[in-house]
């Protein structure tokens, strides 16, 4: 059968290519099953699917989905490890640093939160959310003056920033 297939199609069977295609197919199945599970509220199954997908292929987008599920499942330690790995893979991705800062806030690690927010500001100076998170970190470290300075900067950048005004 393989002889006729290769004879009529003009291609020889390449087992390595088939293996790679199968691996890619399995990766996509796990990734999209995880996305469906996440939408249905099945965090445990979503974590399992995303973990299996990442075992097959390291993918930034899938890591982001897995970090979201960890946050939703109240597993900030796992989310933080994954987000720190993501910042090493793509160090110019502002939203990863913002998410990391939020996770650090959940853990009450204000120094790490400030560091993540400062990195986001270094990438994108005009990001009001980064200044707001830095202000929250300053507030957590009892640095009132810097807190006010960063919150003021956030309000200047985004005039209708209600959260910054309330803090």
Describe each model-derived feature in a short phrase.
Residues 24, 57-58, 91, 125, ...:
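Short coil turns that delineate tetratricopeptide repeat
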Residues 27, 60-62, 94-95, 128-129, ...:
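Helix-start (N-cap) detector for alpha-helical repeat units in TPR-like alpha-solenoids
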Residues 40-48, 73-85, 106-119, 140-153:
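Structural signature of tandem alpha-helical TPR/SEL1-like repeats
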């Amino acid at each position: 059968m393989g002889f006729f297939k290769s004879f009529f199609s003009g291609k020889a069977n390449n087992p390595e290519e088939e293996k790679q295609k199968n691996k890619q197919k399995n990766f996509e199945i796990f990734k999209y099953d995880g996305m469906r599970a996440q939408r249905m509220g099945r965090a445990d199954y979503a974590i399992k699917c995303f973990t299996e997908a990442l075992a097959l292929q390291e993918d930034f987008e899938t890591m982001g989905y897995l970090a979201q599920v960890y946050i939703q499942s109240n597993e900030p330690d796992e989310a933080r490890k994954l987000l720190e790995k993501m910042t090493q893979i793509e160090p110019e991705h502002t939203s990863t640093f913002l998410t990391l800062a939020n996770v650090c806030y959940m853990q009450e690690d204000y120094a790490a939160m400030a560091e993540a927010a400062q990195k986001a500001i270094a990438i994108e100076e005009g990001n009001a959310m980064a200044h707001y998170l830095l202000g929250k970190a300053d507030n957590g470290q009892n640095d009132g003056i810097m807190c006010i300075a960063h919150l003021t900067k956030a309000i200047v950048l985004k005039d209708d920033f209600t959260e910054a005004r309330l803090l």
